[in-house]
Amino acid sequence: MLEVKQLTKTYDGGKRSLQDVSFTAQPGEVTVIIGPSGAGKTTLLRSINQLITDDSGQIRFDDQDICALNKRDLKHIRSKIGMIFQNYNLIESLTTIENVLHGGLARKSTIAGVLSLYTKQEKEEAIQLIDEVGLKDFAFQYCSDLSGGQKQRVGIARSLMQHPEMILCDEPIASLDPKSTIIVMDILKKLAKKRGMLVLINLHQVDIAKEYADHIIGLNDGHIVFDGPADQASSQDIERIYRDSAFATS
């Protein structure tokens, strides 16, 4: 379980991106964060993985407060958290299987990683994951030759190579066409349901969120304005989530 308690983040210049954000997300469920641009969605995901530090609050995962960990322990817990990025974050000059194998680098020695010394078992696992995301025929194709949807699926397979317990997805379908969007969201839903993973996704598309999410969190101006089952998010709730300056002060 992921438990966020009273998380607050203020950037230089006094811009407060998150204000007393609290929620829980469960394994085996897709939790989707929605809200207007600048609501704090990306800041929240980056905080959970401690890519940025917060002013106050707790982020509890795997029975630990991520915010309070030293560098060594933080590196260990990050190995349990996969990241899917809007811009794919692949090495395009490498093949699909090479990119996927890089997902397991945290388990290898520095020398083995630098020299790309992968075992037969690791290569077989990478092929299995590539097949799982529907790209077996593209395993040895350079990622520069893949479509956006295919690249995002490579990113998912690479994340799975990490053996994560939680996957954080920052706008994973923002650049995809409708067909690729469905394929990627189906894969993420399957990870939650069949692998029992905790999947946390930032989205702009409300219709996709309501179709695929078990749990929706609505952010506006750094505040949570909705937190509940997806099927209970009414049109009034959605309107409030996307209302301009819901927490503006004079």
Residue ranges: model-predicted function:
Residues 163:
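Conserved catalytic motifs of ABC-family nucleotide-binding domains
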Residues 178-180:
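Helix N-cap at the start of a conserved alpha-helix in ABC-type nucleotide-binding domains
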Residues 65, 112-137:
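Conserved ABC ATPase "signature" region
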Residues 203-204:
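H-loop/switch region of ABC-family ATPase nucleotide-binding domains
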Residues 167-170:
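Catalytic Walker B motif of ABC-type/P-loop ATPase nucleotide-binding domains
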Residues 142-146, 150:
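Conserved ABC ATPase signature
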Residues 49:
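Helix-to-loop junction immediately C-terminal to a conserved catalytic motif
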